[in-house]
C-alpha cells in the first residue's frame, strides 16, 4: 500500500561564510535590500522560543528579545547606518526575505511534483558563519513517495556541478522563478557568493549542497496500534537518509543505520539525525503529532538545529585556520570566547529538547572536534611560547654582550685616565 501524508514540510539549509572583516558591510547590504527585513523576536509573539531556551543562550542567540519599549522605537527610527552598527555588534542577526507571494514550483515533467516556497530566512552569526534557509511544502500530492523524490532532488539544486546535469528533474513553473537557475541566482545574490567564489571556498568547511530538515506526518491507518512498524522501516530509512523512492530496497541497512541516530522517546514519532539532515517521521494517530509538534519542530527545534550546525562549522573553521600561521594567534581569542559562551552549556530545560541537542552534538562529533582543536592549539601555542622565549633569550644575550663591552670600555677609559 502506497503511503499517504497528512502534512509535511521541508527546510533546505545552506551555510556560507562571510569574511569577518566584511561582516558589517554584509549586514548593511541586507538592510539596504528592500526585500530583506530584519527579524525582531518578541516575547508575546515568540513565547515558545523565549521559554524553550535558557537565559544565557537566549540572550546570545536572540538578542532582539531585549528590543522593546523605547529601545525598539529608537531602533526603528534609526538610520540604516546606525542599525548596521547596532546589528553587527550582536552575536546573531536574523532576516526574513519577502517573497511577495508564495512561489509555486514543479519537480519533474507534466506529471511532476508541485511545491511552493513558503519562507526564506537568513541567520547570521558575528563570526561570519551564516545560514540561508528555505521552507518548502509539496502541493497537490499526498504521496509519501513524492516527498522522498522531492527532498532527494531539491537538496542538490545549488550544487556547483548542476550545470553539468540535465534540468529534467527540476523545473520551476512560476511567474517569480522561470527556471531552477533563478533559485540558485537568488541564493548567490543574498549570500554574495558567486560561482567564482565557490571555487575558492574551503570545501572542508561548507559545501554547496543543502542540509535537509524535514517533517512528515503519515495518515493514521499506516502506523497505529494494529500495524507493524517493520513494514515502514524501508521507507523510514529512505526518508531519514534523504534517498529517492526507487532506491534499492535491499540496500545495506546496517551501514545506513550506523550513520543514523534515531530518537524514539514517543510511541508514534521518530526523529532521525545524520551529519547532513534532521528528519521527523510521525503518525496522525496522535493529534499532537499534526497540531503542536510541527510548530515546535520548525521553531524551537529548528533553531536548536541551526545552533548545532553553527558549533560544528565554527570548530571546523578554527581547525582550518591552523593552516594559516598568521591566524593562530587571532584564533585564541575566538576559541576562548566560544568556550566561555557556548561550549558545554545546557541550552534548555526541556527534556526532549535536551535529548535532541545532545543527539545532534553526538552525530556532528562536536566533542571530538573540540578536543582535537584544543590539543592542536595547546601544542602549537607551546611551540610559539618556546620560539618567543628563544627570542627573549637571544635578546638578553645580546644585551649582556653589549653590557660587557660597555663595561670593558669604561674600565679601559678609567685605566687610561689614572695612568
Q: What does each of the following model-derived ranges do?
A:
Residues 18, 139-141, 278, 286-287, ...:
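Generic "edge-of-domain/loop-turn" microfeature
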Residues 87, 287-291, 346:
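N-proximal short alpha-helices
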Residues 297-416:
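Membrane-associated alpha-helical segments
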Residues 233-316:
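Extended, charged amphipathic alpha-helical segments
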Residues 136, 284-286, 342:
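A broadly conserved detector of short glycine/acidic/proline-rich loop/turn motifs that flank catalytic sites
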Residues 1-269:
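Short Lys/Arg-enriched alpha/beta "domain-start" segment
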Residues 12-14, 132, 271, 278-281, ...:
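Generic structural hydrophobic/aromatic packing signal, biased to beta-strands
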Amino acid at each position: 500500500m502506497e503511503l499517504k501524508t497528512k502534512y509535511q514540510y521541508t527546510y533546505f539549509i545552506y551555510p556560507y561564510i562571510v569574511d569577518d572583516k566584511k561582516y558589517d558591510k554584509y549586514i548593511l547590504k541586507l538592510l539596504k535590500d528592500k526585500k530583506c527585513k530584519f527579524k525582531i523576536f518578541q516575547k508575546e509573539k515568540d513565547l515558545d522560543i523565549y521559554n524553550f531556551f535558557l537565559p544565557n543562550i537566549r540572550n546570545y542567540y536572540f538578542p532582539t528579545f531585549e528590543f522593546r519599549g523605547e529601545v525598539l522605537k529608537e531602533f526603528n527610527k534609526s538610520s540604516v547606518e546606525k542599525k548596521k552598527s547596532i546589528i553587527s555588534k550582536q552575536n546573531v542577526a536574523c532576516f526574513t526575505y519577502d517573497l511577495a507571494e508564495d512561489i509555486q514550483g514543479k519537480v519533474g515533467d507534466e506529471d511532476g511534483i508541485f511545491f511552493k516556497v513558503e519562507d526564506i530566512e537568513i541567520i547570521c552569526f558575528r563570526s561570519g558563519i551564516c545560514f540561508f534557509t528555505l521552507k518548502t511544502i509539496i502541493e497537490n500530492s499526498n504521496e509519501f513517495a513524492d516527498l522522498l523524490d522531492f527532498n532527494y532532488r531539491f537538496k542538490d539544486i545549488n550544487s556547483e556541478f548542476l550545470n553539468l546535469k540535465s534540468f529534467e528533474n527540476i523545473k520551476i513553473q512560476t511567474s517569480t522563478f522561470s527556471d531552477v537557475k533563478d533559485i540558485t541566482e537568488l541564493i548567490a545574490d543574498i549570500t554574495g557568493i558567486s560561482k567564482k567564489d565557490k571555487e575558492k571556498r574551503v570545501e572542508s568547511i561548507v559545501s554547496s549542497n543543502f542540509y535537509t530538515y524535514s517533517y512528515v506526518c503519515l495518515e493514521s491507518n499506516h502506523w497505529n496500534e494494529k500495524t507493524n512498524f517493520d513494514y515502514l522501516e524501508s521507507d523510514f530509512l529512505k526518508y531519514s537518509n534523504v534517498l529517492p523512492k526507487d532506491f534499492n530496497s535491499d540496500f545495506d541497512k546496517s551501514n545506513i543505520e550506523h550513520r543514523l541516530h534515531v530518537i524514539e522517546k514517543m510511541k508514534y514519532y521518530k526523529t532521525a539525525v545524520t551529519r547532513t539532515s534532521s528528519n521527523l517521521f510521525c503518525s496522525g494517530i496522535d493529534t499532537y503529532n499534526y497540531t503542536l509538534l510541527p510548530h515546535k519542530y520548525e521553531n524551537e527545534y529548528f533553531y536548536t538545529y541551526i545552533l548545532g550546525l553553527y558549533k560544528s562549522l565554527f570548530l571546523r573553521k578554527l581547525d582550518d585556520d591552523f593552516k594559516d600561521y598568521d591566524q593562530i594567534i587571532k584564533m585564541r581569542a575566538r576559541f576562548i570566547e566560544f568556550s566561555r559562551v557556548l561550549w558545554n552549556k545546557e541550552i534548555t530545560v526541556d527534556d526532549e529538547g535536551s535529548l535532541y541537542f545532545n543527539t545532534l552534538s553526538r552525530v556532528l562529533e562536536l566533542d571530538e572536534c573540540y578536543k582535537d582543536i584544543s590539543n592542536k592549539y595547546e601544542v602549537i601555542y607551546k611551540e610559539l611560547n618556546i620560539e618567543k622565549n628563544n627570542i627573549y633569550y637571544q635578546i638578553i644575550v645580546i644585551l649582556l654582550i653589549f653590557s660587557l663591552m660597555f663595561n670593558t670600555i669604561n674600565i679601559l677609559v678609567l685605566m687610561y685616565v689614572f695612568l
